[in-house]
Amino acid sequence: MNPLKDLRASLPRLAFMAACTLLSATLPDLAQAGGGLQRVNHFMASIVVVLRGASVATVTIAIIWAGYKLLFRHADVLDVVRVVLAGLLIGASAEIARYLLT
């Protein structure tokens, strides 16, 4: 095999990649799709707000349920702890999403 022949065959591809790299380095606005990045950020921020609201509701319901079971049904503490821990883990999902998105 002739290495020069292989190089000549891939030369247009290398030139195209070099041109794309040069354009993306000099014109970063093209890479951001004309404001599309801000729309995605706004959408993700609204998802985080919804997750925070759901997490507050989930933790509140879990604690109310646990208190009801302990006070009125005389449930074992170990049975109630599982539900409270699950509620806290679900409630932490909004903050984990916030941490990953920022």
Swiss-Prot record:
It is a multi-pass membrane protein. Induction: Cotranscribed with ptxABCDE. Activated by the two-component regulatory system BvgS/BvgA. InterPro entries: TrbC/VirB2 (IPR007039). The keyword Membrane applies. It is found in: Cell membrane. Component of the type IV secretion system ptl required for secretion of assembled pertussis toxin (PTX) through the outer membrane. Belongs to the PtlA family. This is Type IV secretion system protein PtlA. It comes from Bordetella pertussis (strain Tohama I / ATCC BAA-589 / NCTC 13251).
